[in-house]
Amino acid sequence: MDENLTDTQAEETFRDIQGALNNMMTSSLQYFPPFISCVQNVCYNEGKLSLEAGKVTTISIGSLQQPIGIMLLEKQILRISEDPGERPTKRQRTSASPSRETTTTWIELSKLYKSIEDFDVLRGIFSSQIGTQAITRQALEAEGRGDYTKALKLYSQSSEGDALQVEVDLWDDSILECCKRLTLWDKMEESCLVDVDEKDGVVDLDQMWRDEYFKEHYLPFLLRSKTKQFCSGKHDDQFLNFISNSLKDEQQKAYLENKFSDILALLFILQDDYDRARYYTGSCLQTFLEDWSGLDSMMTSSRSAQLQSLQALTEMQEFLDFISNEGNFSTTSSTTSLLKRWSSREPDPKLHSVDIWDDVMTNRSVYLDKILLKFNKSSQLLNSEDSMDCSINTEQLENNFMKKRVMFSLRLAEVATGQVNFPVAKRQLQNSLHLIRDRLKNDRELEILWTHTYSDLNCKKCLILAPLEAIDTAISAIEQLDKVKDIKLLQEDLSTGVRHHLLKSSSLDTITNVLGINGTWDSLDSSLKEKLRALYFGKQADQLDKVISQIATKSFTTLQLAVKIAQSNENNLKTSDSRKKLVTSLMTMTNFCDRLLRLKEEDNEQTPKLDMKMFPGIVIRYVLKSMSYESTEARQKFPRLLQLVELHPGSDVEAFKRKSSDVPCWMFISWINQMVALLDKRESRAVHGILEDLAKHYPQALLYPLKISREQFKFGGSIEEQENKQFVERLNGTLSFPMLDDLIIALEQLTNPDMVFK
């Protein structure tokens, strides 16, 4: 181009191309990944072309092509900084604020990193001087920690002042994102409509179409919030009319169908229009397949994000297939099969955020309501025809569905607790408790499940609370657990009984840990001290060490109960859940004992005054037993057993030898070096059996560590030491690999070539 055109013509041509590219990005409805990636690659490779930073962010997030968008914006930032008109003088470099264009590009870049949840990079961006307010960095840090409540508060407090419009837009988007993570749908709706004008005293929703910014930023969240509230029973005719009118306009209809087919499908399900719902579900699945085919296999984060919506879509399709088949409503067997299928699959508790879980669980509740309504209609029809085949108990079915809804809610609370999203967990617990008490007449099984979820939430919350509040919260959890301790289900269901005692022990441990913080005991009032005394049924105690010791003793005995219950069915561990509960109880007891042993070894002042003679043996036996059940945590703890064998010789060595024989020898391969290092010690007989098995089954894994360590061994003249020496010689004799010996000699010569000539 430079050869055929003058400079002016070339500049005009580049300007036309750049305008055309920006126009293509602006007018795109589908954000087809290959097309978006192609345009961005052209701009990245051709230095004279650039796209608007805001448009790069929008299309990159919409097409899940964040990596190329990040590269493009970073290159544009470098280009701006290299512009002679942008570079400050030496005197200005330390004080001058960046230009408006630079700040805008940095903020748009931060949006891309935020969309892939790379908060480490975000922290780096906002820790430098990019022309933004300090409160933006503080709010983003809170988001990165998962503290969406604090982040929402900070974003809401931020004042526009001297902030650029792009930073204000970042605050608006972040407020909506925090509302989504906290499932605050009414707050989300309020934030979407705060700047929308009113018409005849009613919010003018049509402004969402007239204003391009509103359409891109507010419309997606408005649709989501209104639909979620519709699912919970809040009917809004104005919103439904808005959707109906929008679908009559060809451009608006195309926009909604391309981007929000899943929401449209759910809306029509809520209105019992299953044919239109089926159409939009099929459209959504087709769009998913097209987008998936356009994502490179190396873009793991984008593919993972794309997959997050698949379960909700699949279950929507299953529901529509189920509801359209009249044969499914003659008996409850098909419904039972559907519920089992749903119960067997769920989003990942760690990879999928709470709002994804909320989508799945809320949709399931809607489907159950619709299925129950269809059963009621079928039952009434059969009754009106005086049919003798009407054997469906709709009241019992409604009760079962209500139990499922409570279990969905409690599962969501568990996931939210695991993701440190405590406000969502608390709200789900409140909703489920209302259903248990009012609709299910205090169902005992669900009451225990609710109590365990509540106690788990309180234990996790204690980690971020002030000492006094943490103690009060832990005591509240223990009191709630004690309310259900006499229910028969705890004795009949081993898994439930184990979890009950583990949660109580965890709450007691929380109290002892908090009491160990300097100044906590002195700041407690008399009522709180009385509550602590009631935990272990002790007398009035004013000495901190006695209180800690008593509570630690109570925690230990509680763990013993958990282990006893878990081991009571050890010979019949058929399910993975029962094996998992056994390993969990064993490792919890192990960690408890090991923590106190370490405090004692360190001469810590806050070490509880307990008889710890049994603790080394408990750690050794329980770790090795957990290893026999293929516990990864136990395998990683094995070196600690070798240390305990050295520190506590005697009967513990015999326990080590006996229990280690039940563990597959391959599980010890990672720790061969540590075991070989013990061979000239008195306690080496503990690992003789393990090393013999390794020499028999995996000799090459043992060869190098033994060859290296053998030169450093020093054996004394005692009987035990001579026996150890004989064992080493016998072990070395079994590892006969002439070719490997020659290789080792050759490697030694390479390492010390001067030795060859001496």
Language-model segment annotations:
Residues 1-162, 166-171, 175-189, 193-212, ...:
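Extended repeat-based interaction scaffolds and adjacent low-complexity, acidic/S/T/P-biased segments
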Residues 4, 43-46, 73, 80-81, ...:
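Alpha-helical junction/boundary sensor with strong preference for TPR arrays
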Residues 25-35, 43-47, 56, 62-63, ...:
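Conserved, structured core domains in eukaryotic proteins
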Residues 37-40, 54, 74-75, 127, ...:
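Alpha-solenoid helical repeat scaffolds
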Residues 52-57, 106, 135, 172, ...:
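TPR repeat positional signature
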Residues 58-59, 111-112, 137-141, 174-178, ...:
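Residue-level signature for tetratricopeptide repeat
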Residues 63, 116, 145, 182, ...:
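Structural motif corresponding to the intra-repeat A-B loop/turn of tetratricopeptide repeats
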Residues 122, 151, 188, 239, ...:
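Single-residue signature of alpha-solenoid repeat helices
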